[in-house]
C-alpha cells in the first residue's frame, strides 16, 4: 500500500468525523499585520460598542467593557471619555467610579485619580467604599497629611463606627497618640455607646497609663449617666469593666466604690449585684464569699415564703442552689412543683412558668439522678394530674415525655403517649411533631393516618391540605395527591372560598410540575369559575398558555425521546420549551374568551383590565400589526349626562370600539336580509 492510499479519506469517514468532538468552537484569532489593519479593527470594535450602547445606554457593564477596551489600546483620552459618558448616564454607580479610579492608577496618573475621588466623595458622601479607596490610595503613596485630611473630612459626616476605627488605626500606625485621643474624643460624641468607650479604654491600656485609663472610665460613666434616657445595659457593661480594671490594679476599695455607687443608683440591676458578689468572692476571701451566698439564699427563701407564686424568684433560687448548694436542689425542685401551683383556670403566663419548673425538675431527675422509673412516674403525674387537659394543655410537656421514652428506647410507649395527647387534647404542634417523627422513621402509612386525623381536627387550615398533598407528591403517588386536592376543593372540605382559591393555585402548580399540562389547563377553567370570573385569574390563565408546551409540543418531545426517563421530563421541557405561534394563539384565544364574557355581562371594569393585559402581552410577543390591532380596541373615556332625582349629573363612561363594530355588523346584516326578502317578494 502506497503513502497516497493510506491518506485517502472515504465518505463514511467524513460523515463520522465530527462525532466525538466535544467542547465549544474556539474563537478565531485575528492577525494584525500593520497599523492600518489595527486602526480598522479598533474602528470596528468601537462601532460595535457604540451600537450596543445605542440599544441600551443604561447597560453599565457595557460601558465598563468599552472603557476597558480603550485602556487596553493605550488610549487614555478615549477611555476617560467613555468613563465620563458612563458617569453621565449613571452618576450614582459606585462600580463605575472605582473602575475609573483604578484605570487612572494603572496609568500612573495619580492626580487624575485624586480628582476623581474628590468628585466621587462629594457626589456620594455616604458610600464608604469611595472613602476607603481614597485613604488607601493616599496612604500607599505616603501622603500622611492628605490621608489625615481625608479622614477628618469623612468623619465630619458622622459615618458608621467602622470609619472611625479605620481613622484610629491609621493614627496608631503613624504613632500619633495624641491624634488618636483627639479622634476618640469626637468618636464617643458621635457614637456614645459603651462599646466605643471600651475601645478608647483598650487603647489607653496599651499606650497610656493608669491615670489616663481611669480618666477615660470616669468620663465615660459621667457621660452615659448624664442622659436621662441612658440605656441601663450600656451603663452596666461600662461599670463592670471599670470595677474589674480597678481590681486588676489592686485598687479594691476603688472597685467596691464604683460598684456601690452604681448599685445605689440602679438597685434593680441583677448584673451589678452579680458583679459585686463576684468581686467579693474573688478578693474578699472564702468567708466573705460564703456569707454573700448564704445571704442571697436567705433572701430568696424569705421572698418565696411571702410570694410562693413568684416564678422568676423560684428560677433564680434554683440557679443559686444548682451552682452553690447542689445537695439542696432536689428538695427545692420538688417543693417548687408543690407550692407554686397556679390558681388561675386559664392558660396564662403563670401556668407556662409553672410547667417550665416541672420540666426542669424532670430533666434533673433524668440527667442528674438518672432515675428513669421516677422520671416516668413524674411525667405521668404532670400530663395526667397537674395539667388540666380538659381546659388546656402544653404540647411541650407531651413532646418531652415522648422524647424521654425514645431516649429509653421505648418507641411504642412514645407513640402511645403522643396518641393519648391527640385523643385528650389535640393541638397542631402535637400533630406536627408526631408526623415528623413518623417521617423520620419512614412509617408513611402512619403519617397518612395522622394527616387524615389532622384534617378532621382542622379542615379549615389550608397548610394541612397542602402538606398532606405534598407528602403524597414526594412519595410519588400523584393520584393520591390529586385526590387530596379534589377533596379540599369540595364544599365538604371545610375550606373557605379564599383558601380554596389558594389551594387551586397549588393544585395547578402540582400538575405543571408533573408535566400534566392538559390537567392544569382544565384546572384553570375551574379556577376561573371558582374565582367568580375574576379578571386577574383570566389573565393568569391566558399567560399560562405562553409558559408551558402545547399538546403538540409534548407529543413531539415524547416521539423524539421515547426512552427518556420520566424523572427528567420537567427539566427537559424547561430546556427545550420555546414560545411558538401556537402558544400565542392559545393565549389570545383565552383573552378573547374573557372579553366575550365581560361583554355579555356588561362588566366594563373587567373588560378594561383584560384589554390592558392583552395589550401588554402583544407589546412583548405580538407583531406590529397585532399591536396596532389591540391598540385600536382600547376603550375611550366619554362624559355623559344622566338625571338623578331630578338633577342632571355628569359621569364618566367608556366606549369600546368592539361594540361599535358589532353594532355596525348587525345593522348591515339586517339591511341585507331585508333586501333579500324584498327581492323574493317581487313578481
Curated annotation (Swiss-Prot):
<dbReference type="GO" id="GO:0071004">
    <property type="term" value="C:U2-type prespliceosome"/>
</dbReference>
<dbReference type="GO" id="GO:0071008">
    <property type="term" value="C:U2-type post-mRNA release spliceosomal complex"/>
</dbReference>
<feature type="repeat" description="HAT 10">
    <location>
        <begin position="442"/>
        <end position="474"/>
    </location>
</feature>
<keyword id="KW-0507">mRNA processing</keyword>
<dbReference type="GO" id="GO:0071014">
    <property type="term" value="C:post-mRNA release spliceosomal complex"/>
</dbReference>
<dbReference type="GO" id="GO:0071006">
    <property type="term" value="C:U2-type catalytic step 1 spliceosome"/>
</dbReference>
<dbReference type="InterPro" id="IPR011990">
    <property type="entry name" value="TPR-like_helical_dom_sf"/>
</dbReference>
<dbReference type="InterPro" id="IPR019734">
    <property type="entry name" value="TPR_rpt"/>
</dbReference>
<comment type="similarity">
    <text>Belongs to the crooked-neck family.</text>
</comment>
<feature type="repeat" description="HAT 2">
    <location>
        <begin position="74"/>
        <end position="106"/>
    </location>
</feature>
<protein>
    <recommendedName>
        <fullName>Pre-mRNA-splicing factor CLF1</fullName>
    </recommendedName>
</protein>
<dbReference type="GO" id="GO:0000354">
    <property type="term" value="P:cis assembly of pre-catalytic spliceosome"/>
</dbReference>
<keyword id="KW-0747">Spliceosome</keyword>
<keyword id="KW-0508">mRNA splicing</keyword>
<dbReference type="GO" id="GO:0003688">
    <property type="term" value="F:DNA replication origin binding"/>
</dbReference>
<keyword id="KW-0539">Nucleus</keyword>
<dbReference type="GO" id="GO:0000785">
    <property type="term" value="C:chromatin"/>
</dbReference>
<dbReference type="GO" id="GO:0000974">
    <property type="term" value="C:Prp19 complex"/>
</dbReference>
<dbReference type="Pfam" id="PF23233">
    <property type="entry name" value="HAT_Syf1_CNRKL1_N"/>
</dbReference>
<dbReference type="InterPro" id="IPR055433">
    <property type="entry name" value="HAT_Syf1-like_N"/>
</dbReference>
<feature type="repeat" description="HAT 1">
    <location>
        <begin position="40"/>
        <end position="72"/>
    </location>
</feature>
<feature type="repeat" description="HAT 8">
    <location>
        <begin position="374"/>
        <end position="407"/>
    </location>
</feature>
<feature type="repeat" description="HAT 4">
    <location>
        <begin position="142"/>
        <end position="173"/>
    </location>
</feature>
<dbReference type="GO" id="GO:0000398">
    <property type="term" value="P:mRNA splicing, via spliceosome"/>
</dbReference>
<feature type="repeat" description="HAT 9">
    <location>
        <begin position="409"/>
        <end position="440"/>
    </location>
</feature>
<feature type="repeat" description="HAT 7">
    <location>
        <begin position="336"/>
        <end position="367"/>
    </location>
</feature>
<feature type="repeat" description="HAT 5">
    <location>
        <begin position="175"/>
        <end position="206"/>
    </location>
</feature>
<comment type="function">
    <text>Involved in pre-mRNA splicing and cell cycle progression. Required for the spliceosome assembly and initiation of the DNA replication.</text>
</comment>
<dbReference type="GO" id="GO:0000245">
    <property type="term" value="P:spliceosomal complex assembly"/>
</dbReference>
<feature type="repeat" description="HAT 6">
    <location>
        <begin position="291"/>
        <end position="323"/>
    </location>
</feature>
<dbReference type="GO" id="GO:0071007">
    <property type="term" value="C:U2-type catalytic step 2 spliceosome"/>
</dbReference>
<dbReference type="GO" id="GO:0003682">
    <property type="term" value="F:chromatin binding"/>
</dbReference>
<dbReference type="InterPro" id="IPR045075">
    <property type="entry name" value="Syf1-like"/>
</dbReference>
<comment type="subunit">
    <text>Associated with the spliceosome.</text>
</comment>
<feature type="repeat" description="HAT 13">
    <location>
        <begin position="582"/>
        <end position="620"/>
    </location>
</feature>
<dbReference type="InterPro" id="IPR003107">
    <property type="entry name" value="HAT"/>
</dbReference>
<feature type="repeat" description="HAT 12">
    <location>
        <begin position="515"/>
        <end position="547"/>
    </location>
</feature>
<dbReference type="GO" id="GO:0006270">
    <property type="term" value="P:DNA replication initiation"/>
</dbReference>
<feature type="repeat" description="HAT 11">
    <location>
        <begin position="476"/>
        <end position="513"/>
    </location>
</feature>
<feature type="repeat" description="HAT 3">
    <location>
        <begin position="108"/>
        <end position="140"/>
    </location>
</feature>
<keyword id="KW-0677">Repeat</keyword>
Amino acid at each position: 500500500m502506497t503513502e497516497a492510499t493510506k491518506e485517502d479519506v472515504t465518505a463514511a469517514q467524513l460523515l463520522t468525523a465530527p462525532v466525538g468532538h466535544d467542547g465549544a468552537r474556539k474563537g478565531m484569532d485575528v492577525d494584525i499585520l500593520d497599523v492600518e489593519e489595527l486602526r480598522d479593527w479598533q474602528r470596528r470594535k468601537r462601532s460595535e460598542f457604540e451600537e450596543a450602547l445605542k440599544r441600551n445606554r443604561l447597560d453599565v457593564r457595557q460601558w465598563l467593557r468599552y472603557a476597558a477596551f480603550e485602556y487596553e489600546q493605550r488610549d487614555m483620552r478615549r477611555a476617560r471619555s467613555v468613563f465620563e459618558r458612563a458617569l453621565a448616564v449613571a452618576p450614582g454607580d459606585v462600580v463605575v467610579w472605582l473602575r475609573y479610579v483604578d484605570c487612572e492608577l494603572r496609568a500612573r496618573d495619580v492626580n487624575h485619580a485624586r480628582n476623581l475621588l474628590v468628585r466621587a466623595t462629594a457626589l456620594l458622601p455616604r458610600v464608604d467604599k469611595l472613602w476607603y479607596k481614597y485613604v488607601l490610595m493616599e496612604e500607599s503613596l505616603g501622603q500622611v497629611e492628605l490621608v489625615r485630611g481625608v479622614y477628618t473630612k469623612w468623619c465630619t459626616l458622622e459615618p458608621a463606627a467602622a470609619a472611625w476605627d479605620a481613622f484610629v488605626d491609621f493614627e496608631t500606625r503613624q504613632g500619633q497618640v495624641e491624634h488618636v485621643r483627639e479622634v476618640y474624643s469626637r468618636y464617643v460624641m458621635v457614637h456614645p455607646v459603651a462599646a466605643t468607650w471600651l475601645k478608647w479604654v483598650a487603647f489607653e491600656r496599651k499606650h497610656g497609663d493608669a491615670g489616663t485609663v481611669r480618666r477615660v472610665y470616669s468620663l465615660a460613666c459621667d457621660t452615659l449617666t448624664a442622659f436621662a434616657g441612658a440605656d441601663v445595659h450600656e451603663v452596666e457593661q461600662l461599670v463592670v469593666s471599670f470595677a474589674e480594671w480597678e481590681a486588676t490594679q489592686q485598687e479594691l476599695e476603688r472597685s467596691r466604690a464604683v460598684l456601690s455607687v452604681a448599685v445605689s443608683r440602679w438597685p434593680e440591676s441583677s448584673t451589678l449585684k452579680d458583679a459585686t458578689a463576684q468581686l467579693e468572692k474573688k478578693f474578699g476571701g472564702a468567708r466573705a464569699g460564703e456569707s454573700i451566698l448564704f445571704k442571697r439564699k436567705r433572701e430568696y427563701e424569705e421572698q418565696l415564703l411571702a410570694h410562693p407564686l413568684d416564678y422568676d424568684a423560684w428560677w433564680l433560687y434554683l440557679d443559686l442552689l444548682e451552682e452553690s448548694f447542689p445537695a439542696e436542689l432536689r428538695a427545692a425542685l420538688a417543693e417548687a412543683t408543690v407550692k407554686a401551683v397556679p390558681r388561675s383556670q386559664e392558660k396564662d403566663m403563670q401556668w407556662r412558668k409553672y410547667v417550665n419548673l416541672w420540666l426542669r425538675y424532670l430533666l434533673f431527675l433524668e440527667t442528674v439522678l438518672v432515675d428513669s422509673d421516677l422520671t416516668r412516674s413524674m411525667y405521668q403525674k404532670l400530663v395526667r394530674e397537674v395539667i388540666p387537659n380538659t381546659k388546656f394543655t402544653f404540647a411541650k410537656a407531651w413532646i418531652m415525655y415522648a422524647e424521654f421514652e425514645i431516649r429509653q428506647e421505648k418507641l411504642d410507649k412514645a407513640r402511645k403517649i403522643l396518641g393519648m395527647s391527640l385523643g385528650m387534647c389535640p393541638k397542631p404542634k402535637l400533630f406536627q411533631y408526631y408526623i415528623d417523627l413518623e417521617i423520620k422513621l419512614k412509617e408513611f402509612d402512619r403519617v397518612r393516618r395522622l394527616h387524615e386525623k389532622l384534617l378532621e381536627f382542622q379542615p379549615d387550615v389550608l397548610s394541612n391540605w397542602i402538606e398532606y398533598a405534598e407528602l403524597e407528591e414526594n412519595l410519588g403517588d400523584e393520584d393520591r395527591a390529586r385526590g387530596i386536592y379534589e377533596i379540599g376543593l369540595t364544599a365538604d372540605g371545610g375550606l373557605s372560598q379564599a383558601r380554596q382559591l389558594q389551594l387551586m393555585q397549588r393544585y395547578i402548580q402540582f400538575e405543571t410540575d408533573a408535566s400534566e399540562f392538559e390537567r392544569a389547563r382544565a384546572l384553570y377553567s375551574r379556577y376561573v369559575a371558582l374565582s367568580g370570573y375574576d379578571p386577574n385569574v383570566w389573565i393568569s390563565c391566558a399567560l399560562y398558555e405562553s409558559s408551558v408546551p402545547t399538546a403538540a409540543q409534548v407529543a413531539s418531545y415524547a416521539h423524539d425521546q421515547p426512552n427518556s426517563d420520566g424523572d427528567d421530563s420537567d427539566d427537559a421541557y424547561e430546556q427545550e420549551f420555546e414560545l411558538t405561534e401556537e402558544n400565542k394563539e392559545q393565549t389570545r384565544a383565552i383573552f378573547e374568551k374573557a372579553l366575550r364574557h365581560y361583554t355579555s355581562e356588561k362588566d366594563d371594569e373587567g373588560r378594561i383590565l383584560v384589554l390592558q393585559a392583552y395589550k401588554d402581552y402583544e407589546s412583548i410577543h405580538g407583531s406590529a400589526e397585532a399591536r396596532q390591532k389591540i391598540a385600536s380596541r382600547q376603550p375611550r373615556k366619554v362624559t355623559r349626562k344622566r338625571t338623578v332625582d331630578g338633577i342632571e349629573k355628569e359621569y364618566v363612561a367608556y366606549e369600546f370600539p368592539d361594540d361599535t363594530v358589532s353594532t355596525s355588523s348587525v345593522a348591515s346584516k339586517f339591511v341585507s336580509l331585508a333586501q333579500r326578502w324584498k327581492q323574493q317578494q317581487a313578481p
